[in-house]
């Protein structure tokens, strides 16, 4: 495992440990999302973890899928292991673009949609898969668990 990847393991584990401590201290008791962390909050948790990793200079992509009525979300490190698809520029009508921008949108609206093939070689970071009996913190490559989704 590369040094960079070991740092990601460290950061992800620190983040998960902190979230577990917050849960155990009952800070999340009245929180609709995190009250039973790490269960049933993989999407929101992945968004928070993405912000945290981003603050450490680690760009990520949000990935999610569904399998037999269950959904799951995780991150993929956006580095040289991920294929960057060609952006599809979407032309928005001026009125909609102005409305979008007024709510904090970006001036240039690009829709980049990654496919499974684009991210299949990427490094997965997942701190909520233990709700499915997987590892406490998973930093690694696609396996049978992630292929299901």
Predicted regions and their residues:
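A structural boundary/capping signal
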Residues: 1-149
């Amino acid at each position: 495992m590369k040094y960079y990847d070991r740092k990601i393991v460290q950061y992800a584990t620190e983040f998960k440990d902190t979230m577990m401590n917050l849960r155990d201290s009952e800070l999340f008791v009245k929180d609709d999302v995190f009250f039973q962390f790490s269960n049933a909050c993989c999407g929101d948790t992945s968004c928070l973890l993405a912000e945290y990793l981003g603050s450490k200079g680690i760009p990520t992509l949000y990935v999610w899928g569904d399998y037999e009525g269950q959904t799951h979300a995780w991150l993929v490190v956006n580095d040289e292991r991920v294929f960057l698809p060609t952006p599809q520029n979407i032309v928005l009508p001026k009125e909609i673009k102005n409305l979008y921008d007024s709510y904090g949108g970006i001036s240039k609206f690009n829709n980049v949609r990654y496919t499974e093939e684009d991210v299949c070689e990427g490094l997965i970071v997942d701190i909520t898969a233990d709700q499915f009996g997987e590892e406490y913190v998973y930093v690694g490559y696609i396996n049978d668990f992630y292929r299901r989704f």
